[in-house]
C-alpha cells in the first residue's frame, strides 16, 4: 500500500499546480475519487459568504515566465510551478531590473530553495526564486536592462472551490473527523503527505465494521474548512474527536497540537498511543501553531 501511494504522489500528484480553487485541485480530487469511488466532490460557489469569509474567484494559470533582453527565459513556471506566486493577476509588460527584483520572492533561511508564496485575497503578482537565483540575476544584468513579464492567468467570478469528503459509516452517530488539505502545488511534505496518509487510512478502515463513524475531508486550507463547517454545522455536533494531518512526510520527530482544553478525547488518544508505542514526540500548545486545527 505504501509503495502504491508513494508512486501516486511522486509521479502523478506532485507536478500538478494546485491552489485553493482551479483545475489543479479539481484534478487531484478526481484522481482520489478514481481510487475511492465513494468519495464525494462538493463545490462552493465563488462569492459565497461563509461566516465572515468570502469564497474567492476561481484562479487558473496557463503559463508564466520572465524573459531577458535577449529573449532568454530566466524564470519559467512550466519548469517549476512554485516559481509563480499563487493567485497572481494577469501581466504582459516590460519592467526595469529594479521592478523585477522587487517582485522576486526568496528565502533568507534556505538560499537554494524556491519559497511558496500566495496572494489569495489581495490583487498582486510576483515570481518566487531561490536566493541564489535572485543574486545571480542581480549580478548578471545591468541596471538599465529591461525584462518581459508574462503571466497568463485568469479569474472566474462565477467559479467554484471544491472539497472532497469520504464517510465510513459506523454503528454510532458519533464521529471522528480526519481533515487534511489539498491546495498546495509541488511540495511533498506540505502538503501531499497528509492527503496520501488519509487515503491510506481510508483503505485500512473501510475493511472493518466500526463503532464510530469516520469522516475524512480533503479541503483547501483555512477557507475550505471554514466553508465546510458553515455548511455542516449540525453534522459537526456529532464529532467527538478530530485530527488534522499535515507535514507527516519528513524524517523529523512526530509533533502534535492539542485542543484548547488539552482534555479532549483526541488528546488522550494521541498521547496514550505515542506513549504505548514508545514514540518520541513534540507537543505544541494550541496558540503556538496550526493550520486547520484553528477552525475545528
Model-predicted regions and their roles:
Residues 1-295:
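N-terminal hydrophobic/helix-forming segments and targeting peptides
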Amino acid at each position: 500500500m505504501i509503495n502504491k501511494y508513494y508512486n501516486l504522489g511522486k509521479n502523478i500528484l506532485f507536478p500538478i499546480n494546485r491552489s485553493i480553487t482551479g483545475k489543479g485541485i479539481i484534478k487531484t480530487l478526481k484522481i482520489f475519487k478514481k481510487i475511492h469511488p465513494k468519495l464525494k466532490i462538493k463545490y462552493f460557489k465563488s462569492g459565497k459568504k461563509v461566516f465572515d469569509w468570502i469564497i474567492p474567484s476561481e484562479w487558473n494559470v496557463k503559463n508564466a515566465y520572465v524573459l531577458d533582453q535577449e529573449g532568454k527565459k530566466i524564470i519559467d513556471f512550466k519548469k517549476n510551478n512554485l516559481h509563480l506566486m499563487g493567485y497572481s493577476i494577469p501581466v504582459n509588460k516590460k519592467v526595469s531590473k529594479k521592478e523585477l527584483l522587487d517582485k522576486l520572492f526568496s528565502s533568507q533561511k534556505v538560499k537554494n530553495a524556491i519559497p511558496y508564496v500566495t496572494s489569495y485575497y489581495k490583487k498582486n503578482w510576483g515570481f518566487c526564486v531561490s536566493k541564489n537565483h535572485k543574486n545571480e540575476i542581480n549580478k548578471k544584468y545591468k541596471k538599465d536592462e529591461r525584462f518581459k513579464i508574462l503571466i497568463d492567468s485568469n479569474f472566474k467570478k462565477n467559479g467554484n472551490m471544491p472539497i472532497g469528503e469520504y464517510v465510513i459509516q459506523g454503528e454510532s452517530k458519533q464521529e471522528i473527523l480526519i481533515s487534511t488539505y489539498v491546495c498546495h502545488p509541488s511540495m511533498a511534505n506540505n502538503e501531499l503527505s497528509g492527503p496520501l496518509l488519509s487515503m491510506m487510512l481510508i483503505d485500512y478502515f473501510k475493511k472493518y465494521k466500526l463503532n464510530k463513524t469516520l469522516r475524512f475531508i480533503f479541503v483547501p486550507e483555512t477557507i475550505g474548512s471554514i466553508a465546510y463547517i458553515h455548511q455542516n454545522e449540525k453534522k459537526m455536533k456529532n464529532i467527538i474527536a478530530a485530527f488534522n494531518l499535515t507535514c507527516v512526510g519528513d524524517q523529523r520527530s512526530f509533533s502534535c497540537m492539542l485542543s484548547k482544553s488539552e482534555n479532549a478525547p483526541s488528546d488522550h488518544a494521541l498521547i496514550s498511543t505515542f506513549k504505548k508505542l514508545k514514540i518520541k514526540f513534540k507537543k505544541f500548545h494550541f496558540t503556538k501553531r496550526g493550520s486547520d486545527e484553528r477552525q475545528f
